[in-house]
């Protein structure tokens, strides 16, 4: 029969052994909420450094492939619109993340090119959409793919001013 002191010593030794084990069973999440908030802040600021979160060959929801193509897409539209993203939901693990995001896209300068936004826009036009996005991470923790269903249009393009 083991005495109480022996049980406590055994339990303490076991917990020390568990505490010293490497944390390989639960890998760290590299694209956690804080990292996602930094990514969204860059997008909201119009700072193209947000593409630094992407793998070089990222696959983007709109059929774009590669970090350079995503950057070029945003460079082309930035003179005409400002986009503001609000995160309604976010979760992540070591392989990826999921988010529900509401986006307000506001036209700041007339755009006659329907290829950019599906129609010509006038300064003051605004659209609001909700997207459910899935982010797949590569082994380095960079975004390798962004996918999801077509966004829900909460407010079609209309002039607010």
Report residues per predicted region.
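C-terminal and inter-domain tail/linker signature
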Residues: 2, 6-14, 18-161
